Amino acid sequence: SPCIIIDYLCVTETCFCERFKTNKELLEYITVMFTGVQNLLDTLNLGIVGVAQDYSDYNERVDTVAHETAHLIGAPHDEEGPCQDT
């Protein structure tokens, strides 16, 4: 079956990076965030393995990345999809 690969480039401002004492701490944070995104995508049963500005906490940030990833693969908002009148 065809496979879709989505690569991410995470760009942050200095004040975000200053929250972490080492690059290892930053990497661990990003890894946990994308694990959360993967967990949310798995609940959609889309078979997905796998640029939003976001100033929210961890849980909201995971939701935002998962939401924007769904748009990358063509998912519309609920009110914009083919089932909007049902």
UniProtKB/Swiss-Prot annotation:
Q: Which domain of life is it from?
A: Eukaryota
The record's keywords, sorted A to Z, are: Calcium, Hydrolase, Metal-binding, Metalloprotease, Protease, Secreted, Toxin, Zinc
Q: Name one GO biological process term.
A: proteolysis
Q: What is its EC number?
A: 3.4.24.-
Q: Where in the cell is it found?
A: Secreted
Cellular component GO terms held in the UniProt record: extracellular region
Any idea which positions bind Zn(2+)? 67, 71, 77
> What tissues is it present in?
Expressed by the venom gland.
Q: Which cofactor is essential here?
A: Zn(2+)
What does the entry comment about cofactor binding?
Answer: Binds 1 zinc ion per subunit.
Question: What residues does Ca(2+) bind to?
Answer: 7
Query: Which residues carry out catalysis?
Result: 68
One molecular function GO term is: metallopeptidase activity
According to its UniProt record, which protein family does this protein belong to?
A: Belongs to the venom metalloproteinase (M12B) family.
Know the name of this protein? Venom metalloproteinase
Q: What is the lineage of its organism?
A: Eukaryota, Metazoa, Ecdysozoa, Arthropoda, Chelicerata
